[in-house]
Amino acid sequence: RLFNFARRNLDWNLSQRPASPSQLKQNYSSSIPISNEMATPVNTTDRLKHLRELMASAKYNINAYVVPSEDAHQSEYVAACDERRAFISGFNGSAGCAIVTMDKAAMFTDGRYFLQARQQMDDNWTLMKRGIPGVPSPQDYLAEHLPEGTRVGIDPTLMTATEANELKEKLQARGNGDLVAIEDNLVDIVWGKDRPERPKNTVFIHDIKYAGESHDSKVARVREFIEKENASGLVVSALDEIAWLFNLRGTDIDFNPVFFAYAVVTRDKVTLYIDEAKLTDAVRSHLSGVVVRPYHEIFGELNTLSSSLVETKSHLLVSSSTSFALVQALGTDNVKMSKSPITHLKAIKNAAELEGMRQCHIRDGAALANYFGWLENELLNKDGNLRLSEVDVADKLEELRREQEHCVGLSFSTISSVGANGAIIHYSPQRGSDALLDITKMYLCDSGGQYLDGTTDVTRTYHFGEPTAWERECFTRVLKGHIALDRAVFPNGTSGFALDPLARMPLWELGLDYRHGTGHGVGSFLNVHEGPQGVSMRKTIIDAGFNAGMTITNEPGYYEDGNFGIRIENTCLVVKADTKFDYTGGSGYLKFEPVTMVPIQKKLISSELFTDVERKWLNDYHQEVWRKVSPRLEKGSLGYEWLKRETSPM
């Protein structure tokens, strides 16, 4: 959301129009045009000049303009046509908020992107390091650091109603000015004809054997919530929620199988607002009973609906992530803010989805075993050392992943990072400026795949030479935190906020830490990041407790600027724990079941820091990896022999 920054810059190049899942393998590609964005800052002088001319014009007459990362659906990941903040600033990380005044340009981002933002932005921009003492939030910056009478412009489709109202109140309370909703997006005007076109790719049906529940059943469960809230209906704007609700998938946003649409569910009607050119005959048949309307008509129809809501003294439910523009169309008196029921329904995976997650991670593990077996051989036995680049090997990993059954592409752009690049937490290598693999340095690889039966996300850190004692200690402390979180048993409903310190304590003992959350939910052939659950120090997740059926990643790390990065990530299922007693009185206890099946490098472990309990955990985990993954590998192959060695007992 606008000021609640997300995790990672992910690009999924799905430029084709697959009519069915069978076409996805050949159409999904990450072979995108490569630039030197990480090496050379973008010159934004002319862009900012044009933007400020628009701001100063009589038509708009504003003193500041807010450019968020999100699109009209408050998506974490956006299509190329919606990368407005990246265009105006040059910084293309997934998390950030740009504020442009008549004489300043400020970029607010968090610790995951400090290095990347500094590299990608020119001298026109000031980096505002979120989380550092003394650095204001974007709201406080606007309210406290601008002169009295300031008019702050926003695109109302790109800011949530909650955030817009909070900012407006702050501005007015301090007497500094007002919030101005501008229908035209000023960055789009500056961008002009060079702005990419909005995708119009066809959508396809997500088979019931993978979804595990019909869309009619899902709608019925949503209606139960609507009736419980004594409301007339629910407005759905989050793209992954719409895809989940209708058992449809799309290719409008890179790496994310979603499509541009809105939906309104009432007690007696379901309306899907979508470009009808996206619908095949099969999808139209699938949507029997659903009213289909053009995408942009939702604003007019909500405005018309507002009159009947006034007459009946009823309300439509909207979530806190609903845009200011949608709430304006309905009228604030006609809406009731509520947590979207779909967020929680989607987070609790059914039996088919859980089995799909287990199976796709086994196949993903086979791809990674083949990859690391190949990579080690290239570096140590061939001439790959100081020849293969970060992009070269990332491309090889994608090739091997796509060979797996049901794989249709990547779930995010592979973070393939050597040495100092590993310290850029969400580094995105670009051909031409990417580093060469070096067996004297750490190699961090964070990657994932999209499969018809699930989504994967895994990080491993390896050293193909001789690690230093300090590298081994840091790695071991990260692993100790990973194991501590994995072994946790906790009451049903416990928040990840309470569990997060388990992963950090081994680092805290030395006064070390990492500037990112420890875990996030993972979709089922959907977005690689989903809520409401998470493991983090952020208080926003306190109310999002764990329930059986959820997914979560476990990914502590440690990063030294200019030196190396370490992260160990497994995707896990939240399952019931069999405890001797039940102090909860019936709600029971939970634990994590790791489904990622990839070895953790023993060579990087300092045995003197490792306890017997931790050693047993690692050996048990590796035994499970070998049992599940080895049957999928060719005996005697590089991947098979690598997996056999790496999963041998410590």
Residue ranges and their predicted role:
Residues 9, 13, 25-650:
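Active-site neighborhoods and metal-handling regions in enzymes and metal-associated proteins
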Residues 1-5:
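N-terminal chloroplast transit peptides
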Residues 21-23:
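Compositionally biased, intrinsically disordered low-complexity segments enriched in Pro/Arg/Gln/His
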